[in-house]
Curated annotation (Swiss-Prot):
This is Izumo sperm-egg fusion protein 4. Its main location: secreted. Detected in sperm. Glycans are attached at N24, N219. The keyword Secreted applies. Pfam families: IZUMO. Belongs to the Izumo family. It comes from Homo sapiens (Human).
Length: 232
């Protein structure tokens, strides 16, 4: 749990925002951009507001600051999108605003959106880790909007039998991952070509799980895995 409480750390800057993966994003934000001219009495608000809307996706990823992959479930993406569109639609229902009001409200909605996305991603990971053993759930990658998944290991086992089964499942998962990773590398090459080596699953690279990192994966035993997890 301590690991989950400090997930807000670092993310790639060269990425897009999660909300742009929603099916209505283009339509909604096209409307918002084209109607920004009618929202303020002061002409200076127009370019500022337009820039906020244009850079919305890229700025979102820059502000997420997540140490875990920015992957969100479709259900939670729908919830976030619905909340953001409601706030934006309500803002656009008003007539012209006094100078400075409209861009400030856009910034407030933007910050609330970032907060909602952070919570959605972290809540899914916490729910996953409240299970017993290996669990995977389907997600959308905020980087490129492709279908993806997240794997985690949950410690919420109610009996020694469940715990043993969970550890065995983890061992099988790691061994299968290692075999697949090895098969992706060129046999005749002394080094890895770009794209031929996969990153270690995120839930295996926390500081508390050093014993599950390469090069230990290939020869990991059930006893070793159990001991490592007990230390965690």
């Amino acid at each position: 749990m301590a690991l989950l409480l400090c997930l807000v750390c670092l993310t790639a800057a060269l990425a897009h925002g999660c909300l742009h993966c929603h099916s209505n994003f283009s339509k909604k934000f096209s409307f918002y951009r084209h109607h920004v001219n009618f929202k303020s009495w002061w002409v200076g608000d127009i370019p500022v507001s337009g820039a906020l809307l244009t850079d919305w996706s890229d700025d979102t990823m820059k502000e997420l600051h997540l140490a875990i992959p920015a992957k969100i479930t479709r259900e939670k993406l729908d919830q976030v999108a619905t909340a953001v569109y409601q706030m934006m639609d309500q803002l656009y229902q008003g007539k012209m605003y006094f100078p400075g009001y409209f861009p400030n409200e856009l910034r407030n909605i933007f910050r609330e959106q970032v907060h909602l996305i952070q919570n959605a991603i972290i809540e899914s990971r916490i729910d996953c880790q409240h299970r017993c053993g290996i669990f995977q759930y389907e997600t959308i990658s905020c980087n490129n909007c492709t279908d993806s998944h997240v794997a985690c290991f949950g410690y919420n086992c109610e009996s020694s039998a469940q715990w043993k089964s969970a550890v065995q499942g983890l061992l099988n998962y790691i061994n299968n991952w290692h075999k697949q990773d090895t098969s992706m590398r060129p046999r005749s090459s002394a080094f890895s070509w770009p794209g031929t080596h996969r990153a270690t699953p995120a839930f295996l690279v926390s500081p508390a799980l050093r014993c599950l990192e390469p090069p230990h994966l290939a020869n990991l035993t059930l006893e070793d895995a159990a001991e490592c997890l007990k230390q965690h």
